[in-house]
Swiss-Prot record:
Function, as annotated: Binds to 23S rRNA. Forms part of two intersubunit bridges in the 70S ribosome.
Official protein name in the record: Large ribosomal subunit protein uL14
Family annotation (Pfam families): Ribosomal_L14
Gene name for this UniProt entry: rplN
InterPro entries named in the record: Ribosomal_uL14, Ribosomal_uL14_bac-type, Ribosomal_uL14_CS, Ribosomal_uL14_sf
Keywords, in A-Z order: Ribonucleoprotein, Ribosomal protein, RNA-binding, rRNA-binding
GO cellular component: cytosolic large ribosomal subunit
Length: 121
């Protein structure tokens, strides 16, 4: 679970390093879970990035530090919060994904992100 004003890592190769969550798209709540689409403000990026510092982008949450309870009773939790920047068609803007992603992304129809990820937990 990520709430408003949370700092998150960017887990793709668009050049952005960290972002701040400023809203959840399609929900009235101020909290986002894995697979939710959020709006982010880029806080830090490298100079040659395709996404510059200060821009507002759409992103999907791929990892959260809050525990995720699965239907089989298992609990999954990551070390930090991470997002992948997406375009208007919900495809990732980068060509690589860094780190593992949760299996819940497959149920939410983010197949391109799941296929690019090195590991799906």
């Amino acid at each position: 679970m990520i709430q408003m004003e949370s700092l998150v890592q960017v887990a793709d190769n668009t050049g952005a390093r960290s972002a701040k969550m400023i809203g959840v798209i399609g929900k009235r709540t101020r909290q986002a879970h894995i697979g939710d689409i959020i709006t982010c403000h880029i806080r830090e990026s490298i100079p040659t990035a395709s996404v510059k510092k200060g821009t507002v982008v759409k992103a999907v949450v791929v990892r959260t530090a809050a525990p995720i309870r699965r239907d089989d009773g298992s609990v999954l939790r990551f070390d930090g919060n991470a997002v992948v920047i997406i375009d208007k068609d919900n495809n990732p803007r980068g060509t690589r994904i860094f780190g593992p992603v949760a299996r819940e992304l497959r149920e939410k129809k983010f197949m391109k992100i799941v296929s690019l990820a090195p590991e799906v937990l």
